[in-house]
Amino acid sequence: MPVMRMLKIRFIDSIIERIAERVSNRVADLLEQRALFFSETKKLFDQPETDSGAIVCAGGQLIHQRNEIECMSYAKVIGELPPPQHPPEVPRRRSELCKQADFSLDAYRYWSSALRLPLTLHRKHWEFFYICQALHERGFLSTGRTGLAFGVGREPLPALFASLGCAIVATDQVSDDASRDGWQITGQHADSVAALEKPNICAPPTFRERVSFEAVDMNSIPVHLAGRFDFCWSACCLEHLGSLGHGLRFIENSLNTLKIGGVAVHTTEFNLLSNAATLETPGLSIYRRCDIEGLVRQLEEMGHHVEPLNLNPGATLIDGYIDLPPYHEEPHLRLRIAEYDCTSIGLIITRGT
């Protein structure tokens, strides 16, 4: 090959390499910005907004008037019934999606009252109800039981469980990481046991006796927590661990903290629109049916028991509404994240031998 032609080819190759490098760097920058955006947006999901905005029906109909949205409050849809005095008997919880039907249960009113939460059609309140009910009906919310909370934030659950006689180790990420990721500025991070006190739920002396705090990385659970607890839980945390795989590995690893026969209850984001395409960024991932079903198969092959999946999304009016930013106090059972409609899913897993 002539020398001049070889030089031209090398020159062209060098230009192509430079262009490819610039494109690669630009794509990386865009992915980082996209991940940051969705991570910051997700931090607002559990802090209901009261600003006027729009709710979109699954069929595509927009409702712009705030007074129309207010017509779908808990009181208007379910009623204003008082909470029962004792935990009612209800069908045993399965691994399932958040649905309107659960908000009409006496058990939802009971646990909302116990947690000092207002009755509202909000999926975060459903997650708390789901965790409480799942643990209660399996006999874990009683004196002498031990529980471990992951990514606890400012949840009222440790205070409630302590008031019922449980000893709780509450964990959250280290303060520097929480500050970097934006959880402190939104008031969704705990760095001490004092941050979790709820005097209207549990008397302070009892709380301080039964609740302790540790900083824990959910991607690297310390060995000293292994095999110590009757139950563990997390409420919409594992989707923030870095990827779909990181969250699934956390669920598997969380079982190592349990005694044999102990129960883990975890909630996370579920993709209602697609079993193929989904959102996966360092700050936020949305789980598909295939991800959940694959996890169930894996855990059961390892000898654990997963409560049967019920992925019926419900068929009521509220089940069909998708909340758009700025998000509302209610109804907020389904919401739009990027191009995906999603809701909360709860998983109940018993550690096997």
Predicted features by range, described:
Residues 125-144:
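Conserved alpha-helix/loop element of class I SAM-dependent methyltransferases that forms part
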Residues 148, 155-221:
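Class I SAM-dependent methyltransferase SAM/SAH-binding core
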Residues 213, 308-353:
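A C-terminal cap/extension of S-adenosyl-L-methionine-dependent methyltransferases
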Residues 245-262:
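A short glycine-rich, Lys/Arg-flanked "PGG" loop and its adjoining helix->strand segment in the class I
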